[in-house]
Amino acid sequence: MANLSIRMYSNCLRRTVSFQVIMPNDPRADVPPMEEKYARRGMKTLFLLHGYTGDSWNWVPEELAAKYNFAIVVPSGENAFWIDGLSTGHEFGKFLGVELVEYMRKTFGLAKTKEDTYVMGFSMGGFGALHTALAYPDTFGTSAAWSSALIVHEVAKMTPGYDNGVANYDYYRECFGEPSKVLESDNNPETLVKKLKAAGKELPEIIMACGTEDFLIERNREMHRFLEEQDVAHEYWEDAGIHDMVFWGKCVQKYVPVMFG
């Protein structure tokens, strides 16, 4: 298993950034070989997104990547919700959806088709996984979103001086744009769904999951109902769990074989 730490200059973020790449390209003699059907089809690529306060660390077991023959790309989205902010150097959505994908294509020959390109995340990264696949449906074929921080309806109600203890009004405005306009903007996954449907475009495969004791469960249920109302095919799963790696680990073990098997 190759573990690479890469530094590159990002024009979207106007600085040098670091990210991790895990590639199952060095089979070991002391473990069973990869099944021929996975080796023969070529390596797929999973872009893996962290949550609020997180960074570029891999949280998908490497043995799954080795078994199903997929590379894992783990960038850092800081606390920017994986979308394009207002300030110069804050195009985190374009960095992930365009710049980083193109870098992986030209450097490693990976992620060449949407069928071979996946995005997965939890919490803020779950929002990012869903939003990114909908914003770049010709690039990402599958989105897996765990315990997603689908907070745009809350952001829409924020006014100057707002502070919920996690972040203040200025932070949310920087990430999402003017709160009063966020519901109609492309930073709202619901808006992206409606636009794709109106244009007759194929939507990515969507997989969502949330723990029944998670503080974000109602937000995820609302998105599930919205997708049902829009007749958007998707997988939605609930199980006992809170907002933690125990539940997200269950999601990975349950759905990675479905996604890559």
Residue ranges and their predicted role:
Residues 1-261:
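Non-catalytic cap/lid and distal C-terminal segments of serine-dependent acyl enzymes
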